[in-house]
Amino acid sequence: MEAAGAEKGDVKILAVTVLTSLDRADLDDLGFACDVQQLVLSRARRCLAAGCDGVISSGLEAPALKGELGERVMVVTPGIRPVENRPADDQKRTVDVAQAFANGADYIVVGRPIRQAVDPRAAAEAIQTTIAGIFKT
């Protein structure tokens, strides 16, 4: 991270904190003696100190990231799942589009809800409509 941060130029460098497919039980299995939020914050602090611009983190931890690190940390949130059709998949720490932005995400990453939709275009357009409604002035 430090080498990337030092040589990044105009490129934004992001670092993964904790995968959205992991929860506290998984961290215990991996030997981490802390909760998810503590690990996310610890890794985010290290990422910023190494020159990264932001982190990839569940929207569940975004409020803590913004609360502790402020606007200097860019938060990119994967694991976006629609409220009306939240599937049971391998993602354990998910939020919907509105929750992600309300919690402080700067950007979202949406994969399966679009890719696996019966009508991917309609799914993408519905997400765009939600985002437009959140940010309309």
Feature locations, PLM:
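Glycine-rich loops and low-complexity Gly/Arg-rich segments
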Residues: Q37-S42, I80-R81, Q99-N103, A132-F135
